[in-house]
Amino acid sequence: MIAHIQGKLVEKSPTEVVIDCNGVGYHVNISLHTYGLLPTTDFVKLFTHLIIKEDSHSLYGFAEKSEKEIFKLLISVSGIGANIARTMLSSIEPKQIINAIGSGDVGTIQSIKGIGVKTAQRTIIDLKEKVLKLYDLDQVSISQSNTNKDEALSALEVLGFIRKSAEKVVEKIVATMPDATVETIIKQALKNL
């Protein structure tokens, strides 16, 4: 219904912004990912998705069209509402969500606050085929990079690093070097931990 909004950025916080569009202030819910991509100038354009319920109209905004499309996929899953989808996009990068769904990585999806095992599994079951087709992902390369990532995380845990902090570093490495070997991931992680 409302494809995008552009105007003057009046207020911003990590979860919402107010955009003045010709004298009307629109309250738009955003993810942390979008918050990080907001321009430093006063003028902003967000791609939006309007959710109309019996008791409310909620507008969700995204800095990138791709994030909006992922949001729409996520809310199509039974048990995932707009707020949980926004939490998912705030917790991990949109590309990581796509890779986790495409590779069937229940652990990554489940690591998001508010997502249990059943919801993570349902998300993968409902969206895996769509994600593989829409994003033209090669299932073999995804599972290979996930295996390397998991092996590297296990090795870092054995070396005494806390899993959460190691996970963040390893995710960044895998995002920049998707074909990295286990050894390369560990070496790069040791430099950053």
Swiss-Prot record:
Annotated protein name in UniProt: Holliday junction branch migration complex subunit RuvA
Region (Flexible linker): 143-145
Main location: cytoplasm
Chain segments carrying region Domain I: 1-63
UniProt record similarity statement: Belongs to the RuvA family.
A single MF term (Gene Ontology): four-way junction DNA binding
GO biological process, any: DNA repair
Pfam families: HHH_5, RuvA_C, RuvA_N
Organism: Flavobacterium psychrophilum (strain ATCC 49511 / DSM 21280 / CIP 103535 / JIP02/86)
